[in-house]
Amino acid sequence: MRTGNATILPATSKTPSAYLAFDTGPGNVFIDAAMRILTNGEQHYDHNGALGAKGEADIDGAIVDDYLTNEPYFQQKLPKTTGRELFSDDVARSIVTKMKSAGKSTEAIIATITRITAESIVRAYEQFVVPLLEGDGIIDEIYICGGGAYNPNIKKHLQSRLPKSRVSNLDAAPSKLDPSAKEAILFALLGFLAICGRPVPVAADAESKQPAIMGVVTPGQNYHDVLQIVVGDPDFPSKRVLGRVIM
């Protein structure tokens, strides 16, 4: 998972399209925006969650619950996706202004906004994932990637609220992928599959039920060289063959 998106892989399913994917909430957007606002642009994120950790004892739970209860997106059913058009810097600014007016410290503000993100993830799991699980309803493993992987306050809250789940960064998974490299690797894979004309299974909750080629290729000056590398045939495309693709 990223801090604003969840992808659920059933442990027992051998069907590629059995996975579930949706956006959980603001991710790092609010935290990063609040850091810029509170430091006059000198800091763009909470490095290692240091500032938020100092304010954890002063988290304003009422603000967390109020936001998560009254933002309609959190009650919206799947499939759903969102972005900065909803979870914007302006929303973060309104929370910062409200807390500053109440005399809250910078540390408390960052901790509270971090908790909004972390708790939005937990509630999304409880609402959309746990009901689909068989047996004891426990999520076995949660792997974090992206910027949130480097904010221990998020990870700590997830582990606290989901004590029977293993919460780790993505590099602890069998793939051992660097948490910050996953998206780049994914785009490279999608580009490879797009050039090969290989469709990708869509999530089980997606409005489209048909596998689709994910992405559009914009050829550059070395496009033919790229095709040769991808398909493994120096005569491609003159022979009108796809080449040797090993997956």
Model-derived regions, located:
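Glycine-rich phosphate-binding loops at beta-strand->alpha-helix junctions
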Residues: 138-161
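Short beta-strand scaffold segments in enzyme catalytic cores
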Residues: 3-10, 32
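Glycine-rich phosphate-binding/hydrolytic loop that grips phosphoryl groups
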Residues: 115, 173-224
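A short acidic Gly-Thr/Ser loop motif
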Residues: 1-4, 25-27, 144-152
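C-terminal helix-coil-helix/basic helical segment that borders enzyme active sites and/or dimer interfaces
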Residues: 126-136, 143, 166-175
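Conserved ATP-utilizing enzyme core subdomain
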Residues: 16-118, 197, 210-233, 240
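Phosphate/ATP-binding catalytic cores across multiple sugar-kinase/actin-like superfamilies
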Residues: 106-138
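Short helix-capping/linker segments at secondary-structure and domain boundaries
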Residues: 37-44, 126-128, 192-203
